[in-house]
Amino acid sequence: MGRQKELMNRCGEMLHIRYRLLRQALAECLGTLILVMFGCGSVAQVVLSRGTHGGFLTINLAFGFAVTLGILVAGQVSGAHLNPAVTFAMCFLAREPWIKLPIYALAQTLGAFLGAGIVFGLYYDAIWAFANNELFVSGPNGTAGIFATYPSGHLDMVNGFFDQFIGTAALIVCVLAIVDPYNNPVPRGLEAFTVGLVVLVIGTSMGFNSGYAVNPARDFGPRLFTALAGWGSEVFTTGRHWWWVPIVSPLLGSIAGVFVYQLMIGCHLEQPPPSTEEENVKLAHMKHKEQI
């Protein structure tokens, strides 16, 4: 055991990446991969079973818990944004340097692409058998919707843009409230579960129109994968060239979310007064008694 542990420690030292931003990018990639793998995996199960193995609620539950797991995996390293819209909001608030935006976005999109690839491999035979060895983007035998979002037949472009805008703004407002130490901070370690709950609520209330992407990486990465995996360029033209809406609208919605939270909550929160020396002594004494 001793030699094995020593060998593992040496391997860890050799593989350790010293460039912090690269470590963070890898964490974002893996976290987003987990999000897409479990989230789109749940969609695949519902679609390919034609509703016998789940439904709309199970998809929303899966995406909510997938976000939670992705944050738990990557949070300590990168903050687990898992979404370019979240990274954009944090950079806009000067909580993150702007250099992180393109790097995080690329890593998140790559993670989503790889997550879609895993789902495709996992359900490879079922996908091909679903429509007699053909791949359709839309229609009763469409399977591209397993991976990326597409608008419902009733939805026009303006309403769809507003749908993604509001969904992302709501997400950002809630995320900012969760991570704001001067609001009602979530107990440490529960942030991931709370953000997952936010995604679940957005899905169950705003998912009907187009599947609530509210995440450019989660939508574009898998969409690009489907284009390369056999569905072709139709994934970009279906829905009146819908593909750009889940990219542009969430980024604008994230800025709206920042303004709404800051103007109505963030700018008005009062910082707690600094503790006095006497209070610090009392706190230290209480901690000492608890240890005894």
UniProtKB/Swiss-Prot annotation:
Instruction: Provide the catalytic activity annotation.
Output: glycerol(in) = glycerol(out); H2O(in) = H2O(out); urea(in) = urea(out); H2O2(out) = H2O2(in)
GO terms in the biological process aspect are:
cellular response to hypoxia; establishment of localization in cell; glycerol transmembrane transport; odontogenesis; positive regulation of immune system process; renal water absorption; response to ischemia; response to retinoic acid
Q: Does the keyword Cell membrane apply?
A: yes
What happens biologically when this protein's gene is inactivated, per the record? AQP3 knockout mice have normal perinatal survival, growth, and serum chemistries but are polyuric because of defective urinary concentrating ability. Mice have dry skin with reduced SC (stratum corneum) hydration, decreased elasticity and impaired lipid biosynthesis. The glycerol content of SC and epidermis is reduced, whereas that of dermis and serum is normal.
Asked whether the keyword Transmembrane helix is assigned, the reply is yes
Primary localization:
membrane
Motif annotated as NPA 1, chain positions: 83-85
**Keywords for the protein's UniProt record, in alphabetical order:** Cell membrane, Glycoprotein, Membrane, Repeat, Transmembrane, Transmembrane helix, Transport
Q: Which residues lie on this side of the membrane: Cytoplasmic?
A: 1-24, 75-78, 93-100, 178-189, 265-292
Q: Which organs or tissues contain this protein? A: Detected in principal cells in collecting ducts in kidney medulla (at protein level). Renal medulla and colon. Predominantly in the inner medulla. Expressed in basal layer of epidermal keratinocytes.
Alphabetical list of SUPFAM superfamilies matching this protein: Aquaporin-like
Membrane topology type: Multi-pass membrane protein
User: Which subcellular locations apply to this protein?
Assistant: Cell membrane; Basolateral cell membrane
Transmembrane feature ranges: 25-42, 57-74, 101-121, 160-177, 190-206, 243-264
Motif NPA 2: where? Answer: 215-217
Q: Where is this site: Selectivity filter?
A: F63, Y212, R218
Intramembrane portions: 79-92, 211-224
**Which residues get glycosylated?**
N141
A Pfam family annotated for this chain is MIP
Q: What's the domain of life for this entry?
A: Eukaryota
Q: Which residues lie on this side of the membrane: Extracellular?
A: 43-56, 122-159, 207-210, 225-242
Quaternary structure per UniProt? Homotetramer; each monomer provides an independent glycerol/water pore. Could also exist in other oligomeric states.
Q: What is known of its domains?
A: Aquaporins contain two tandem repeats each containing three membrane-spanning domains and a pore-forming loop with the signature motif Asn-Pro-Ala (NPA).
Give the UniProt family note: Belongs to the MIP/aquaporin (TC 1.A.8) family.
Record-given protein name? Aquaporin-3
The record lists the organism as: Mus musculus
What lineage is on file? Eukaryota, Metazoa, Chordata, Craniata, Vertebrata
This protein's encoding gene: Aqp3
